[in-house]
Amino acid sequence: MAAQRNRSKESKDCSGLVLLCLFFGIPWEAGARQISYSIPEELEKGSFVGNISKDLGLAPRELAERGVRIVSRGRTQLFSLNPRSGSLITAGRIDREELCAQSARCVVSFNILVEDRVKLFGIEIEVTDINDNAPKFQAENLDVKINENVAAGMRFPLPEAIDPDVGVNSLQSYQLSPNKHFSLRVQSRANGVKYPELVLEHSLDREEEAIHHLVLTASDGGDPLRSGTVLVSVTVFDANDNAPVFTLPEYRVSVPENLPVGTQLLTVTATDRDEGANGEVTYSFRKLPDTQLLKFQLNKYTGEIKISENLDYEETGFYEIEIQAEDGGAYLATAKVLITVEDVNDNSPELTITSLFSPVTEDSPLGTVVALLNVHDLDSEQNGQVTCSILAYLPFKLEKSIDSYYRLVIHRALDREQVSSYNITVTATDGGSPPLSTEAHFMLQVADINDNPPTFSQVSYFTYIPENNARGASIFSVTALDPDSKENAQIIYSLAEDTIQGVPLSSYISINSDTGVLYALRSFDYEQFHELQMQVTASDSGDPPLSSNVSLSLFVLDQNDNAPEILYPALPTDGSTGVELAPRSAEPGYLVTKVVAVDRDSGQNAWLSYRLLKASEPGLFAVGEHTGEVRTARALLDRDALKQSLVVAVQDHGQPPLSATVTLTVAVADSIPQVLADLGSFESPANSETSDLTLYLVVAVAAVSCVFLAFVIVLLAHRLRRWHKSRLLQASGGGLTGVSGSHFVGVDGVRAFLQTYSHEVSLTADSRKSHLIFPQPNYADTLISQESCEKNDPLSLLDDSKFPIEDTPLVPQAPPNTDWRFSQAQRPGTSGSQNGDDTGTWPNNQFDTEMLQAMILASASEAADGSSTLGGGAGTMGLSARYGPQFTLQHVPDYRQNVYIPGSNATLTNAAGKRDGKAPAGGNGNKKKSGKKEKK
């Protein structure tokens, strides 16, 4: 701490000195000269490094006077100045390996400041390496395992030694202790690092020597030489190259004739020098007559021979049995067992349980005493010699203690989860002839420890939950079992911390820590995510607690919560309806347009079907159930109205199903000139001024009364003429001549409908001028038609163009519909305050304006029956490309229903047949005459 404070003070003094020099303009000289020294590492503190006063050209006494001191940064000061001798000395022990690791050159740099000159001198001290480190292995012992039958020449890698020194002082060589089986080979890597390998020179014999002890020595090249060692233990694995050998070639035993069945007579033992399965010996009888085979039982694993039937001395007093021993590799050995049957004995042993230590914990070490037994037999000599035994499958064994006491000790590890208590039977048998025995029974309880973690019934779980579920709803239940008891088996459930789309999992799911029931904390949305992955942890309450995890996959099921969305025709913001063009010559099945819709749901909830919900002319059009294609169901007739209104419904297959509707307007005409001609055939009131309205009404009533008869005659003549021309047109095949094929809508799906042109006809409420709007193209949203034309081409109607006229019923004039009037913002020209939409353009020359005025004013008288249906809007009319450029479906204002004739009760309806509940008369875009007008 003191050194740190000194360095901090020196740093502050130096910083202040530098600032002072800068303030007074004193020049700062640095790096004028570099002074170099070289010292070996591990010098003692105060060792001489160099004469700094001499190298600086100063006397030793001037060092203090001139304020000469060492300036260093960020490192513990390794050197200091001796002001009396003027020499540079070490400030402490210098360890090159600590400073520079194994770098080839180790240099310590710092500066010396002469304060009165404000001058810095660079000092560079090279620390040279000495051989102060011996090579060292990471471990003191190394185990190498080699199979007994490995061929000579096999190589085995050995660990490398580490020497932090460099150059000749670093690791140079390896040596192996002398032996007759192995040699050492030293290899070098690409970076020059040497590593040793153990090479087998001669074959091994595990039975001769199972473990070979070798010493590997690593040496450096320093002076003095240093080295490090590691003990290498080579364990030889066994191969089956030895046959079993009995401990005795012949076994003899004498037994009383009254021995009980199951009494063990003797145990034969054969040994095999091999290990593992090669050394496991099994026993069997060989060449034993059937009569003798029933008398004895041989344990094939232990070699124990027991009585399986009562012996009879009078029947047979001697048995000669041949036993065969076989190892796992089919090597055999045989031995003889000679059994002599004898007589005598009358007292049974007495067995007493002196002490019982119950319960015993299941983690008790082997050899723990659980009971102390005392045995006694009143007989003498051999008949009074008592032996105790227990069943072989029990994890206990009996050990003889002093005098006649036995200890029952743990022989194999206990597991309370497998057996929680043992009913132990101890049998005491004397050595009489026949032997007598006594049994003692007692119960030993095993106490539990927390040695088993909770286990789930499945490796992983998955469950399903419908979306839009109620908050707090139960989702699923997981169950874990712990075979321990009491608090060691009390399970606590929890969820592992995780995030879903940046939100903690705990905000979506919670779990009951006692029951394992999972609850939804919020309503899930299938469209947000389909699946949740989580980890459930089950921990017991033991000390220390144990736990286990299981993965749970929660799948969100889709519900029909999204209605279909209409993509085409798109609904514009101004409330207009798209208009499609169907030529009069269209055959049945002609593709008029296509309704395109999508559903955000999935599966069956997203399957869409289309149907025609409503049509102004039933039976004229049909909608594809699965494609949404609107096609003609029959050939178009002359009586079919110019404007057809269709309502198409799109419905999904969810439960309950959701639907959406779209209204389509179809103009029945062959081309734009024909549509405009039909519009031009309407007549409009001659005057909209209201100042002389009363006079005009009187004149109008008188005029109507006078010309009524003449009108009827002219109308009949005109109808006859139209009927005559209609017959001529039908005879000519109804073909359209002189019109390019590119002037019609394509039938290749939605793309064709997007490559059409729309037109607007707007009538103002305050002006008698009519305008034909040619919307500007929106090249960002639409496709460009291959056939284009000039937007400013004049639109002309031939004077001699004549159209057949259908019978037009006389309908009473309906009052105006107030909600069809234009707002002030929608009125074009000088009548309105502004244009309602900047996507359309008004006529830009006097000719266009006057022509359209004349056409619309001429048709005003026919507006009352609502059959004038020419309109535009957000959809397309599918008209010829020569009358306007391509434009976006959604960006065209819709004025087709917003028609109001000033000074008149005449209005235009939105769809044919919607006005006053009467069906309109229409046909082939023909000119129509209005009926008799009503007075206000």
Curated annotation (Swiss-Prot):
Residues 926-936 have a biased composition (Basic residues). Residues 718-936 are cytoplasmic. Residues 33-137, 138-246, 247-351, 352-456, 457-566, 574-687 form the Cadherin domain. Potential calcium-dependent cell-adhesion protein. May be involved in the establishment and maintenance of specific neuronal connections in the brain. It comes from Homo sapiens (Human). One of its GO terms (cellular component) is plasma membrane. This is Protocadherin gamma-A10. Its main location: membrane. It is a single-pass type I membrane protein. GO terms for biological process: cell adhesion; homophilic cell adhesion via plasma membrane adhesion molecules; nervous system development. The keyword Membrane applies.
